[in-house]
C-alpha cells in the first residue's frame, strides 16, 4: 500500500526557535513530536533565502535561473515539471492549499489557471500572499488582534481546518494522496490573533549576541529586506521595537504548532497516521535580530539553514537526528525515493532517501544562488564564502565575506583576504566558479570575481 504524503510548509521560519532544534522561548511540542516517528534533519539548506526562488527550487528540483523563478514576482517557466507531477503520474491524488508565490504579483489570484500548477490537480490559492498587515510598515506597530480574525478565520487556523477537510475527503479512498498546505506565517509583518498576540512578554525576549554587532558588511547594512522594504530604516536597531516584533513572531510560531497538533490529532484519530508521511518545513529562515537584522535574504548562514522534521511510518526509523546534508533541490527526488517512485524528469537535485534512512553522510556543500542581484557563495561544515556584486537599488558592493564556521559560529569575524585563510579562500572560490559553469548560470547573476 502506497504511503500518503502531507507537507506542511511555512514561510520564513527560523530553524532554532523550534524546540526540536534547541529553541527555548516558545514551546513547539506538536512539531517536535513528529521526530518520534521519523527524523529531524540537522542539515537542510535552501540555495536562495527568498520566497519565490526557494519555492521554485523545492517544487522543480532546479536552481532559480534554470526554472525561471529567480526572484519574487517571476513565475516558474510553463514548461517546468514539479515533483507533484511525478506523484500524480504514479497514481497519487495531488492537492495544494495556501500561499503559492510562484506567479506574477500583478495577476496573483486572478489568472492562476494560466500558470504552471506543477502537477497539483486539486489546488486553491485563496490566501494569495497572506500578509495583509501592511499598517506595520507605516508606524512600526502590529495591527490590533481584533483585525486578525479568530480560530476559524485567521489564516493559519483556516488553512489547518481546510487541510482536515481534505483529509476527511480521502477516508476510504484507494488512491493515495500527496497534499501540501502552505502557511504564510511567521512571515512579516509580525502580528497574530488573540490570544497569541499577548502570549509572550516583549520585555522577556532574548536578544541575539550579534544584535549590536558594530561592523557588518555594507550590503547587510543597506540591502537586507528587513531594513529596506517593510520597516522604517533602522527600526530594529531600537531594542524595544525588536522585542515587540519578536514577541509577535513567537506567537505566530505557537499558533502554527497548535494547528500542527490539530492536524496530527485528526490523522491519528482517523487511522491515516500509520500510512502517512508528514513533513514539516519552510522556504527560508529569519534573522530575528541576528546582526541587528530582521527577515531574510543576503548571505548569513542562518537564513539558508532551515528546519525539516518528517515521519517515516513503517520504515524502522524513529527519533533520529539525521546528519545527511539535504538541499531543497533534492526534495522531490528524495521524497519519490522514500516511496519507491521513479523520478521521470531532469533535476539539479539528487535522491538522498537512502542516506536519510541509513543516516549516512552526503556531499556537504551548499551553493548560494542569487535571486535578482549578483550574489554567489558556498557553505560547508567549516566555512562560508560569499561574494556580492550589487544591491537591490543598483549600488555596487565589494565587501565579500569569509567565515570560519567552527571558530566563529555567530559569523561576526570576516576573514576575507586574511592571509591565514588565503588558500581556503582560493579553493572555495574555484568551487563556486566550477559549480556555476556546470549550472550555466548567466553572468548577469554573478559577481565578476566568480565569472
Where are these regions (language model features)?
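Formylglycine-dependent sulfatase
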Residues: 1-398, 409-437, 444-451
Amino acid at each position: 500500500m502506497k504511503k500518503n504524503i502531507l507537507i506542511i510548509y511555512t514561510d520564513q521560519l527560523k530553524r532554532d526557535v523550534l524546540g526540536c532544534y534547541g529553541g527555548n522561548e516558545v514551546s513547539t511540542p506538536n512539531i517536535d513530536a513528529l521526530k518520534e516517528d521519523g527524523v529531524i534533519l540537522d542539515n537542510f539548506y535552501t540555495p536562495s533565502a527568498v520566497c519565490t526562488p526557494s519555492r521554485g527550487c523545492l517544487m522543480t528540483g532546479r536552481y532559480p535561473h534554470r526554472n525561471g523563478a529567480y526572484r519574487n514576482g517571476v513565475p516558474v517557466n510553463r514548461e517546468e515539471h514539479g515533483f507533484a507531477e511525478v506523484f500524480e503520474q504514479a497514481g497519487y491524488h495531488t492537492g495544494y492549499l495556501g500561499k503559492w508565490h510562484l506567479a506574477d504579483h500583478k495577476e496573483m489570484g486572478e489568472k492562476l489557471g494560466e500558470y504552471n500548477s506543477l502537477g497539483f490537480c486539486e489546488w486553491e490559492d485563496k490566501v494569495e500572499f497572506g500578509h495583509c498587515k501592511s499598517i506595520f510598515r507605516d508606524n512600526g506597530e502590529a495591527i490590533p488582534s481584533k483585525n486578525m480574525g479568530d480560530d476559524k478565520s485567521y489564516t493559519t487556523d483556516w488553512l489547518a481546518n481546510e487541510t482536515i477537510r481534505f483529509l476527511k475527503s480521502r477516508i476510504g479512498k484507494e488512491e493515495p494522496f500527496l497534499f501540501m498546505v502552505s502557511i504564510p506565517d511567521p512571515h512579516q509583518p509580525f502580528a497574530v490573533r488573540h490570544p497569541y498576540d499577548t502570549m509572550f512578554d516583549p520585555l522577556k525576549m532574548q536578544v541575539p549576541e550579534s544584535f549590536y554587532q558594530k561592523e557588518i558588511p555594507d550590503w547587510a547594512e543597506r540591502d537586507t529586506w528587513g531594513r529596506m522594504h517593510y520597516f522604517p530604516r533602522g527600526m530594529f536597531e531600537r531594542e524595544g521595537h525588536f522585542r515587540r516584533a519578536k514577541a509577535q513572531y513567537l506567537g505566530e510560531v505557537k499558533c502554527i504548532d497548535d494547528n500542527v497538533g490539530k492536524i496530527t490529532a485528526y490523522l491519528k484519530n482517523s487511522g491515516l497516521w500509520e500510512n502517512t508521511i508528514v513533513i514539516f518545513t519552510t522556504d527560508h529562515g529569519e534573522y530575528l535580530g541576528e546582526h541587528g537584522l530582521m527577515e531574510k535574504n543576503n548571505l548569513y548562514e542562518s537564513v539558508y539553514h532551515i528546519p525539516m522534521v518528517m515521519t517515516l511510518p513503517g520504515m524502522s526509523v524513529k527519533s533520529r537526528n539525521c546528519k545527511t546534508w539535504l538541499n531543497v533541490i533534492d526534495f522531490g527526488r528524495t521524497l519519490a525515493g522514500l516511496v519507491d517512485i521513479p523520478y521521470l524528469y531532469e533535476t539539479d537535485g539528487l535522491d538522498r532517501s537512502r542516506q536519510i534512512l541509513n543516516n549516512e553522510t552526503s556531499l556537504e556543500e551548499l551553493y548560494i544562488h542569487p535571486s535578482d542581484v549578483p550574489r554567489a557563495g558556498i557553505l560547508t561544515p567549516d566555512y562560508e564564502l560569499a561574494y556580492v556584486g550589487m544591491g537591490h537599488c543598483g549600488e555596487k558592493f565589494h565587501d565579500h565575506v569569509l567565515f570560519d564556521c567552527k571558530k566563529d559560529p555567530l559569523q561576526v569575524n570576516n576573514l576575507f583576504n586574511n592571509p591565514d585563510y588565503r588558500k581556503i579562500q582560493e579553493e572555495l572560490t574555484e568551487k563556486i566558479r566550477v559549480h556555476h559553469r556546470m549550472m550555466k548560470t548567466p553572468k548577469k547573476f554573478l559577481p565578476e570575481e566568480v565569472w
